[in-house]
C-alpha cells in the first residue's frame, strides 16, 4: 500500500486524527505522522524549528497537512514527492491582517513540488486569499474549492476531495516512466 505522511497541526493530533486515519486506510493507504518536537505554546511564531523537522521526515514522500499542518508542510516538506494542503493557515509574512504570524513568505516553499490545494467553500475571505496565492505559487497543482465545507476536515465533501487527490497521486505513481 502507498504511504501518506501526515504533518500534525498541533500536539495531540494523532489522537484527534484517528477517524481521518481510518478513512485514509479504507482508501488503500498506510499512514504515518511526522514526529515533531513542540517548543513552547503553539503556534510558536518565534520559532521556525518545526519546518526543518518536517523536511527531515518527508523527503520523497506523499505529504498531507491540514490547517497549521498544511503551513508546516508547505514550508517544511521541501523535498516531498507530492503535497496535499488542506485549508492552509494564513500566518505568513504577507498576511499583514494577522498581528501574530511567521515572518516567512509563503514563497519559501518549493514551487516544483506537485501539490493539491483544498479550501472549504464556506471558509472566510482570508483563507481563500491565502489558498489562492499558494495555489498560484505551485507550478504543478490542482485546486479544489470544497463545496459546503467550512474549516472542517471531517466534512464528507472534504474527505471526498482528499480521496480524489490520493487517487490522482496513486494513478500518477502507477504510470510507467516514459
Say what each PLM segment does.
Residues 2-30, 35-37:
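Short, surface-exposed "cap/lid" segments of acyl-processing enzymes
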Residues 38-39, 146-153:
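Histidine-bearing beta->alpha loop at or near hydrolase active sites
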Residues 41-57:
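Alpha/beta-hydrolase active-site loop
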Residues 61-62, 82-84:
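Residue in the alpha/beta-hydrolase core beta-strand immediately N-terminal to the catalytic nucleophile
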Residues 64-69, 73:
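Gly/Ala-rich beta-loop-alpha elbow adjacent to hydrolase catalytic centers
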Residues 85-93:
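Active-site nucleophile loop of the alpha/beta-hydrolase fold
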Residues 94-137:
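The feature captures the conserved acid-bearing segment of alpha/beta-hydrolase catalytic domains
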Residues 154-166:
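Post-His helix in hydrolase/transferase enzymes
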Amino acid at each position: 500500500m502507498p504511504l501518506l505522511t501526515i504533518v500534525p497541526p498541533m500536539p495531540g493530533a494523532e489522537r484527534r486524527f484517528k477517524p481521518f486515519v481510518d478513512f485514509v486506510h479504507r482508501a488503500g493507504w498506510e499512514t504515518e505522522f511526522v514526529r515533531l518536537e513542540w517548543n513552547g505554546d503553539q503556534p510558536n511564531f518565534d520559532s521556525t524549528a518545526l519546518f526543518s523537522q518536517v523536511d527531515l521526515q518527508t523527503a520523497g514522500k506523499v505529504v498531507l497537512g491540514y490547517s497549521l499542518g498544511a503551513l508546516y508542510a508547505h514550508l517544511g516538506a521541501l523535498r516531498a514527492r507530492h503535497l496535499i494542503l488542506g485549508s492552509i493557515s494564513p500566518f505568513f509574512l504577507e498576511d499583514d491582517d494577522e498581528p501574530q504570524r511567521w515572518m516567512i513568505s509563503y514563497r519559501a516553499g518549493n514551487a516544483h513540488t506537485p501539490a493539491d490545494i483544498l479550501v472549504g467553500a464556506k471558509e472566510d475571505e482570508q483563507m481563500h486569499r491565502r489558498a489562492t496565492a499558494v495555489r498560484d505559487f505551485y507550478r504543478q497543482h490542482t485546486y479544489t474549492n470544497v463545496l459546503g465545507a467550512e474549516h472542517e476536515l471531517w466534512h464528507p465533501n472534504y474527505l471526498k476531495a482528499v480521496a480524489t487527490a490520493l487517487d490522482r497521486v496513486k494513478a500518477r505513481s502507477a504510470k510507467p516512466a516514459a
